Amino acid sequence: MPATVVLTFRNLFKNGRTPMLVIASVAQPLVWLVMFSQTFSRLADTPLLRSLGYRSYLAFLVPGMMVLAVLFTALQSGLAMVSDIDRGMLDKLRVSPISRVSILLGRVLADSATMVVQVAVVLGVGTLMGARVETGWLGTFGMVACVTLLGVVWASLANLIALRSRNAELTMVAGIFVTLPAIFLSPAYFPLRFQPSWVQTVAKANPASYVIEVGQSLMSIGNDWGRDARMLAVLAVAALVAMPATVAAFRAATH
């Protein structure tokens, strides 16, 4: 456990030495939040949208931008892994008595802390713009937890790609190839029932869609604690499955 704590702070301090990466991963969702909420608000703030229970297009948009922030942070986690490989950091850790699990857990915990801050910033800006979480602090906690757990799963997959490829360009391309469709083929910008049938079909296989829908419900419609608890459980199981797969890839990469 002490090794995990040390590595967590090491990764956090490393992020602190390149603050532009953290700022950029938050700035892009914020730019999209402001741009889309202002550009499409008159188009989307219609009786039809409100008939679905959403208070405003801004409140509808915030959860999707929270997810976008953590997905980009997850991609950066994979790129950081490639950087550690290239600089020989993993070789140094490999010959140390630190377990492989502690090394990866330290990275995941650092990523999780970063994601919580980013999600809070996006939600805070959305609140300043007029959005409100109708389910209060408990709903806010549930929304942040779901989004962060999704980010942990995504970061584990990004690290898995990084360990397999050992190539920053390939990790970046693969990450973008997965991340952008995960956002656009989801209810992040418009309710699924307003979108083409093929998008609705693809969205059903998109884990980001379910997290975004939970967030949108907690923002505007109300809480369904049974559904929210199931979502948290599924994400926790997914994280527990993704982590061992990444550990196995790490063992193979440092064998």
Residues covered by each model-derived region:
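Aromatic- and glycine-rich beta-strand/loop motifs that create alpha-glucan
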Residues: 1-28
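Short, membrane-interfacial amphipathic segments enriched in basic
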Residues: 1-8, 154, 198-209
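Membrane-interfacial helix-loop-helix junctions in multi-pass membrane proteins
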Residues: 14, 48-51, 183-241
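Residues that define the loop-to-transmembrane-helix transition and helix capping
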Residues: 19-20, 59, 101, 169, ...
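Hydrophobic alpha-helical transmembrane segments of multi-pass membrane transport proteins
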Residues: 31-38, 55-129, 150, 158-159, ...
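Transmembrane helix segments
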Residues: 38-44, 162-205
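Alpha-helical transmembrane segments and their short interhelical loops
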Residues: 100-180, 225-247
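Short cytosolic juxtamembrane segments of multi-pass membrane proteins
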Residues: 249-255
